[in-house]
Design a protein with these regions (language model features):
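Short acidic/histidine-rich active-site segments
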Residues: 1-6, 14-26
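Residues at alpha-helix termini
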Residues: 18, 37-38, 59
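A local structural micro-motif
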Residues: 23, 42-43, 64, 154
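Conserved, charged catalytic cores of large soluble enzymes
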Residues: 50, 54-74
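Charge-rich, acidic-biased intrinsically disordered regions
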Residues: 69-76, 111-115
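Metal- or metallocofactor-binding catalytic centers and their adjacent structured scaffolds
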Residues: 77, 81
């Protein structure tokens, strides 16, 4: 996918030599061929295995009373874990540019416009390698919950995430005028674009054939 190697054994050998001791996919199934072709040595494989199992033993995975085998289901989505998840989400936010806009003061705002294909899309929240939560809160829902009845919240999807129209019988850009109207009637606009797991993920980005991406005019692609 990255055009660095030409075969799977070459990829496996390169990864092992660069210190990648474990692979969750199927690339390391080609390590034997890489060894037979002289791309790696038995010592390379032994070193990776020793480091991997040293870590697993230090974590206690092979202890007689391994704590990971006795985690009760009751702790799933418990208040403590939800609080930790929320804290992790807060700390992971990256603010690239502000110019004094944030934080928003709802006491000074009468109308908030929320625009974008990911503004009210749960698929954009879950990523890949995910479990199933009992509740999802989209950006639109989060803003609505926070401001309550104090601030009016307008919403426009604006565009489809990767098609040129939202409605099958619509014309290209069929929701763009709605987005413009929402923006004109809002004191501040929260624009939510980006991708979701239908368009990006492990070994997916390179083969994305729909040409999707963020465009200044909301027309995707």
């Amino acid at each position: 996918h990255h055009h660095i190697t030409t075969t799977a054994p070459e990829s496996a050998a390169l990864a092992i030599k660069m210190g990648c001791d474990v692979n969750c996919g199927n690339t390391y199934l080609h390590l034997l061929r890489a060894l037979e072709d002289g791309l790696i040595t038995e010592d390379d494989i032994t070193t990776a295995a020793e480091r991997l199992f040293t870590t697993r033993f230090m974590l206690g995975e092979f202890d007689e009373n391994c704590e990971y085998n006795s985690i009760p289901y009751e702790v799933v989505e418990c208040p403590e874990h939800l609080a930790l998840s929320e804290e992790a989400a807060r700390r992971s936010v990256v603010l690239l540019k502000n110019d004094g806009i944030l934080p928003l003061d709802k006491a000074k705002i009468k109308t908030i416009g929320v625009i974008g294909p990911n503004a009210n899309d749960r698929m954009a929240l879950i990523g890949n390698y995910h479990g199933t939560a009992s509740r999802y809160i989209t950006v639109l829902e989060g803003i609505q919950d926070y401001v309550g009845d104090d601030v009016r919240v307008l919403y426009a999807e604006g565009c489809h995430l990767y098609k040129d129209r939202v409605e099958g019988l619509g014309l290209p850009g069929d929701r763009l005028s709605e987005a413009e109207t929402v923006a004109e009637h809002s004191d501040v606009v929260v624009l939510v674009t980006g991708l979701n797991e239908n368009l990006e993920g492990e070994e997916m980005d390179q083969s994305n054939s729909v040409g999707s991406g963020d465009k200044a005019n909301l027309l995707l692609p």
